[in-house]
Amino acid sequence: MTDRLTQLQRCLDQVMEQFCATLNFIDKRHDFEPFNDKEPKMTDKHASVATPEEFSNGIDELSTDIIVKIRQITTLIDSLPGVGVSAEEQLHKIDSLQKKLVDIEDEKIHAIKKKDDLLKQVDDLITVFVGGIADSRRGTSLAPENVQEDNDIKQEAEVPTSSEAIEQKIANEKIESKIEGEYNDNINEDSDSKSADSELFMDKDDADNISESISPGKI
């Protein structure tokens, strides 16, 4: 809401615009009239001439708007504080308004301070609440019963409980025994081949001895 002086200025601007609009309507929409009875009435096909009834109604409407606006201006002028009021009364009223303004400013400062205090209290409560939750979670995670539960879970995880785990363990044992058997067979084959080679070498020595014994020089 604006003050009365601003309202008065706006009303003066509006009434000036209405005066200009009225003059423009009269200039653009009036009919042609001769200066005397001897001159013929002139016409212009490009002009936007209003009929006598339209012209009269337009003038009435524009005049009514101007009258209403002038009454508003008069009312605002009569309501101005300087009209019919002495200088002492005006100064007293100004002092009273200044005191009210100071009181309102103090209330504003007090409300802002109270708001800041409430915000700080809320922040402290949130900090305490979050810290309590964190401490409770930390204490729960470090409790002895929880450690024992974790160990039990690990032991249960190491022992196969499902049929698939048991079958997998049996298959692994079979594979290990098969690999061990193949390794032993390879060792046995190597020892047999070494024995056969030694027998062949011994047979060759015997053959040499026999050939020497039956040589022509000894016969």
UniProtKB/Swiss-Prot annotation:
Residues 210-219 have a biased composition (Polar residues). InterPro entries: Med7/Med21-like, Mediator_Med21. SUPFAM superfamilies: Mediator hinge subcomplex-like. GO terms for molecular function: transcription coregulator activity. Disulfide bonds: none annotated. It comes from the Eukaryota. Its main location: nucleus. It is found in: Nucleus. The keyword Coiled coil applies. Belongs to the Mediator complex subunit 21 family. Component of the Mediator complex. Component of the Mediator complex, a coactivator involved in the regulated transcription of nearly all RNA polymerase II-dependent genes. Mediator functions as a bridge to convey information from gene-specific regulatory proteins to the basal RNA polymerase II transcription machinery. Mediator is recruited to promoters by direct interactions with regulatory proteins and serves as a scaffold for the assembly of a functional preinitiation complex with RNA polymerase II and the general transcription factors. This is Mediator of RNA polymerase II transcription subunit 21. It comes from Candida glabrata (strain ATCC 2001 / BCRC 20586 / JCM 3761 / NBRC 0622 / NRRL Y-65 / CBS 138). The lineage of its organism: Eukaryota, Fungi, Dikarya, Ascomycota, Saccharomycotina.
